[in-house]
C-alpha cells in the first residue's frame, strides 16, 4: 500500500518503477483518501519478501511518495478485499431461485435482475471470491468482472 501526493503523472511513475524492474502488476487500485491531496494505491505483485522490500525502498525514494507499507511484516495487520460482478444466465424462475439461494449462503448481493440474467455482487477475501466463482460456474456461460484488491492497515 502506497500513499502518494495527488499530482499528474505520479501513478505512471509508480507503475513504471515496477515495469522497469520486470514485475507484472497483478492488481492495481487507486483512490482518493479523505484528504483530496493524497491518493492511496494498493499494488499486488508476485515477488519474494526480499523483492518486495527492495521495491518498497525504491518507492520511498520517489518524491511524491508519502509512505509505503508492505504485506509480510509479522506485526502488521491489515484488511484486504476484492469484488466481483458476475452476470449469470437465467432463463427460468427455478434457476433464479437457485441463484438467490446461493447468494444467501455466500452473503452475496443481487445487483440486478434482467429478463435473461442475474447480476451478483461478491466482495471478500480471496477465499470468498474463489468459493463464489466455483458456486456460480454451474450455471454455464457466466461473465465475470473482477476488481483489484483494496487494502487498509489496522493502525
Predicted regions and their residues:
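Long, contiguous binding/interaction regions
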Residues: 1-39, 44-155
Amino acid at each position: 500500500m502506497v500513499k502518494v501526493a495527488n499530482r499528474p503523472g505520479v501513478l505512471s511513475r509508480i507503475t513504471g518503477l515496477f515495469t522497469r524492474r520486470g514485475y507484472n502488476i497483478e492488481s492495481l487500485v487507486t483512490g482518493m483518501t479523505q484528504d483530496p491531496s493524497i491518493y492511496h494505491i494498493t499494488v499486488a505483485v508476485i515477488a519474494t519478501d526480499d523483492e518486495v522490500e527492495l521495491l518498497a525502498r525504491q518507492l520511498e525514494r520517489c518524491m511524491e511518495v508519502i509512505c509505503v507499507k508492505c504485506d509480510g511484516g509479522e506485526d502488521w495487520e491489515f484488511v484486504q478485499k476484492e469484488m466481483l460482478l458476475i452476470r449469470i444466465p437465467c432463463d427460468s424462475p427455478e434457476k433464479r431461485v437457485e441463484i438467490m439461494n446461493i447468494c444467501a449462503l455466500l452473503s452475496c448481493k443481487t445487483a440486478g435482475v434482467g429478463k435473461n440474467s442475474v447480476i451478483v455482487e461478491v466482495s471478500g477475501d480471496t477465499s470468498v471470491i474463489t468459493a463464489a466463482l466455483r458456486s456460480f460456474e454451474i450455471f454455464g456461460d457466466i461473465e465475470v468482472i473482477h476488481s483489484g484488491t483494496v487494502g487498509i492497515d489496522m493502525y
